[in-house]
Amino acid sequence: MTTKLSSFCFLTHGLAGISCEREHGSSRRFFYLPSRRLVSTSCKMRQQRGFDSSKRQEVKKGSPKPILSINSGLQSNNDEESDLENGSADSVPSLKSDAEKGSSIHGSIDMNHADENLEKKDDIQTTEVTRRKSKTAKKKGESIHATIDIGHDDGKNLDNITVPEVAKALSLNKSEGEQISDGQFGELMTMIRSAEKNILRLDEARATALDDLNKILSDKEALQGEINVLEMKLSETDERIKTAAQEKAHVELLEEQLEKLRHEMISPIESDGYVLALSKELETLKLENLSLRNDIEMLKSELDSVKDTGERVVVLEKECSGLESSVKDLESKLSVSQEDVSQLSTLKIECTDLWAKVETLQLLLDRATKQAEQAVIVLQQNQDLRNKVDKIEESLKEANVYKESSEKIQQYNELMQHKVTLLEERLEKSDAEIFSYVQLYQESIKEFQETLESLKEESKKKSRDEPVDDMPWDYWSRLLLTVDGWLLEKKIASNDADLLRDMVWKKDRRIHDTYIDVKDKNERDAISAFLKLVSSPTSSGLYVVHIAAEMAPVAKVGGLGDVVAGLGKALQRKGHLVEIILPKYDCMQYDRVRDLRALDTVVESYFDGKLYKNKIWIGTVEGLPVHFIEPQHPSKFFWRGQFYGEQDDFRRFSYFSRAALELLLQSGKKPDIIHCHDWQTAFVAPLYWDLYAPKGLDSARICFTCHNFEYQGTASASELGSCGLDVNQLNRPDRMQDHSSGDRVNPVKGAIIFSNIVTTVSPTYAQEVRTAEGGKGLHSTLNFHSKKFIGILNGIDTDSWNPATDPFLKAQFNAKDLQGKEENKHALRKQLGLSSAESRRPLVGCITRLVPQKGVHLIRHAIYRTLELGGQFVLLGSSPVPHIQREFEGIEQQFKSHDHVRLLLKYDEALSHTIYAASDLFIIPSIFEPCGLTQMIAMRYGSIPIARKTGGLNDSVFDIDDDTIPTQFQNGFTFQTADEQGFNYALERAFNHYKKDEEKWMRLVEKVMSIDFSWGSSATQYEELYTRSVSRARAVPNRT
């Protein structure tokens, strides 16, 4: 807004204004200052742009000091003196100023506000007034230059400038010899009155401008509130704020310069050149203010992009779930391969012994064969001798005929007789030798047969004497599934199935021997043999059925699959009967299921007012018996190519939950515990108590575990009726109604209310979800049912994650022999091209998904801070969030050939094992972590964790510098606040401990490697919960 004033500004000869103190000073006074000339007056008022928002708070501490200056020039030629003392004494009104509104004339007011929306300006353009030269005025004249500087007035009026004062000033000139005529004096008085009118108009224009400024200031206050809100969201712009702080210092310097200029303005200004320099300085300030405004616009645009980030995170995190699935699949494959290797090693030893015995027997057989061949040769020689003897006998008979004929014939006969005697003796010797060889051969054959018989007896005896407890769980699960299959196919009675199942449960030798005996017989004979074993023993264990959407390694997306498999195996080892019921997905790992087959029966379940058939498959996974349900529904619920992420997930899993309970009912099973997991099977709890307990499936207590309260599966209340539940009864605030809307239901809330036991994956997370922030709307429900709600820390598969047997490592090691850890560290440095010049340089590892939940801003900061502290840093992981992935790709390029930093933006199973084994320190700076596994794996491999105190991290990592924690539990370094300062404190302490005392550090490594993070302790806690709940149920027969 610009207001032009077409008026004259008059200043008396030698009149100058002096500004007083800043904001709370006294009223201003005018003084007479000598001057020699009158010059043209320029009046200008402009509202300047504000400073940058980062400087706003500093500016508010002190009120601005606006300057209103009027340069008036009055050019006159005086020919004669005049007596002013008798002139009229009309008063000239004083000029008023309001420093708080920020007006200025021939100056500038810096409002010190940085709101880009404030575009209004008040500009009182320059008005130059020059008095016409009097025709009679002399050419000699002096110019009087005066400057009135009106400062802060605090609402008070300035002293008036009156005509007598002007006359008095003019009389001073008269005393110096100048002459003013009466005509000139009258003309001068006319000009003074005209100036009074113009000054009044100037006051009115100023008042109008001040009103506009009031409106602008009110707009500023509203915008200031919005800016305060935006400032709280600028956590990612800390570096820009620091830059703004530097600019603030620059502005303060400029303010000091302005203050000096203000004081200099108090003194008379002797030359127009000084005013020109001052104007240029003001123009420079304006340009700087424009630059600051552009910075604010840039910050605001970046803030808008930050707001969109949160909305994309949830969608993009789902894309990472596939990576986690492949990781867990590889882990399970490794576990199976290790079990196979251990079994092969035993078989190899037995095979070696048998080969040694066979080789001994082969030698004996070869020796006996040679002896037999020699005996055969002797027999052939004997046969030749016998033929010769026969011929001789024939000759003798002929000779007897001619016996009497000749003496020669008689002598010949005597000679022949002697030869025969010799031949007979030789024959006897040959017979003796042949007999000895044959006897020796028979003895060898007998010894060989005895050896074979002894080996057979030893093998049979070993098979009979082998303890039944040493049989693998796959064997017992297969036997259990066989019994269940006969029951579902109605080939045995329900009571007989219960008794046989109980014998399997107890690993009864009789059922084992029977199974071995009938293994090759037909099914009818096998069933008859099994039914002969039926008895009524009592069982000491629990019968637990898990109904879940995932199970590692066959159908795994996240930690849920690990819990179902790990907890199931741990409970099985404790002597409990454990079964799993899963959907039969088309995309699951079928090669990880042993003895998978379909039963010759179907189970019908209700959905959408109809009965649908379900095909039942059985098999063993990791030694656990598993039932797979394949719905014969036209929607092909689990034939979609993925586990989750379908539009009808609510319908898919509510159908599966009812079909699972129908399977238990129709098979006649009587479990003690039905354990359901996450929202996908949360429907089991209300279905069990509302529909199936009245039908006779009433032996079980319901346990529900929520692995992440971020996912609650809410849907329209009308969809709940598809599985047969009463919508009117359950869509209530005290049942399943979601807190967000009255027409939506929450399966997780229903499971919490209808379950007998409710658990989550760590004690700290159990406390966090009972708050409004962590509970995601369920905190009040959890607090109401707090007596049955508990957090149990998950475990890890210590067979797969074992540095003593890990095949991915360059060298295996354990807590008693850490030499292998140094070898793995050297191997990793060589593999990644890192410097090995200093073997004691600490190596910091990080394996994670690069998502906001994992604290990516702290991970990024850790890279640079590790270098500053003299360490090396290795990162393995990728991000489903595009801008995060791009950011870390840029950092990767920055350190591509660096000696101490390497970023690997992918997931590599083998490399992850090596990083765990090689790292000295391992960072987990998560913002939010229900349980977490990496800290446990890191400690298992001798890497000391640096973790934020949240969720499961707070339950597994305890600071070694915290004296309130017993020494035996201290195992890492922790920090509370999710900022760089908190993280730096923990990282620096870790480096100091590492470098200060090597021997003490090695003892710490040995200690953390010895900590038991297996499923054993967790399974014991679940076992206690199960037992207490079942005991209470049996004590109260009519439970609800």
From Swiss-Prot:
Taxonomic classification: Eukaryota, Viridiplantae, Streptophyta, Embryophyta, Tracheophyta
Organism: Arabidopsis thaliana (Mouse-ear cress)
Residues forming coiled coils: 187-466
Biased composition (Basic and acidic residues): 52-61, 112-124
Binding site for (1,4-alpha-D-glucosyl)n: 679-680
Expression (tissue specificity): Expressed in leaves and flowers.
Matches recorded under HAMAP family: Glycogen_synth
Summary of subunit composition and partner proteins: Interacts with PTST2. Interacts with PII1; the interaction is essential for the initiation of starch granules biosynthesis in leaf chloroplasts.
GO CC terms: amyloplast; chloroplast; chloroplast stroma
Xref: Pfam families: Glyco_trans_1_4, Glyco_transf_5
NCBIfam families assigned to the protein according to its UniProt record, in alphabetical order: glgA, PRK00654.2-4
Keywords: Amyloplast, Chloroplast, Coiled coil, Glycosyltransferase, Plastid, Starch biosynthesis, Transferase, Transit peptide
Any one GO molecular-function label of the UniProt entry: alpha-1,4-glucan glucosyltransferase (ADP-glucose donor) activity
This protein's name: Probable starch synthase 4, chloroplastic/amyloplastic
Note: Plants over-expressing SS4 have increased levels of starch in leaves and display a higher growth rate than wild-type.
Positions annotated to bind ADP: 556, 559, 562, 849, 854, 906, 908, 916, 933-934
A biological process term (GO) from this entry: starch biosynthetic process
Transit peptide endpoints, chain numbering: 1-42
Location in the cell: Plastid, Chloroplast; Plastid, Amyloplast; Plastid, Chloroplast stroma
EC number: 2.4.1.21
Pathway as given in its UniProt record: Glycan biosynthesis; starch biosynthesis
Annotated InterPro entries: GS/SS, Starch_synth_cat_dom
Gene: SS4
UniProt family annotation: Belongs to the glycosyltransferase 1 family. Bacterial/plant glycogen synthase subfamily.
Taxonomy, superkingdom: Eukaryota
